[in-house]
Regions:
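Active-site neighborhoods and metal-handling regions in enzymes and metal-associated proteins
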Residues: 1-117
């Protein structure tokens, strides 16, 4: 992540890493921009085609929050209107970080001390 990179490149890397380890990427949910409104554009997909999507510029802030499934990528929303499950009943994991694009790369704003690099 750095100025000039494209959002499709981020999604592609996440997808390749997940699928390369025999997992799938949920396509029903995505990351998002952070600004004056909490969930705003751009949508940040966790799958994609390299060389596509919005160009990153210094000062952009957005989340990456992939949901990675042990089975297939399909999900279903439970009747409570909030809880999401995998369609095939397999395990899933989700995590989120907020990133800021800097002149020299990226700052992970939500990284715990032990995660900083």
């Amino acid at each position: 992540v750095k100025p000039g990179a494209l959002l499709g490149d981020i999604g592609y890397v996440i997808q390749q890493h997940a699928e390369g380890n025999y997992y799938s990427v949920v396509r029903d949910y995505c990351g998002h921009g952070i600004g004056r409104i909490f969930h705003e554009d751009p949508q940040v997909l966790h799958y994609g085609t390299p060389g596509t999507g919005m160009e990153l510029v210094e000062g952009m802030t957005f989340t990456i929050e992939p949901m990675i499934n042990a089975g297939k990528s399909g999900t279903k929303l439970k009747s409570d209107g909030w809880t999401v499950e995998t369609r095939d009943g397999r395990l899933s994991a989700q995590w989120e970080h907020t990133l800021a694009v800097t002149a020299t790369g990226v700052e992970v704003l939500t990284a715990r001390y032990e995660e900083r690099f």
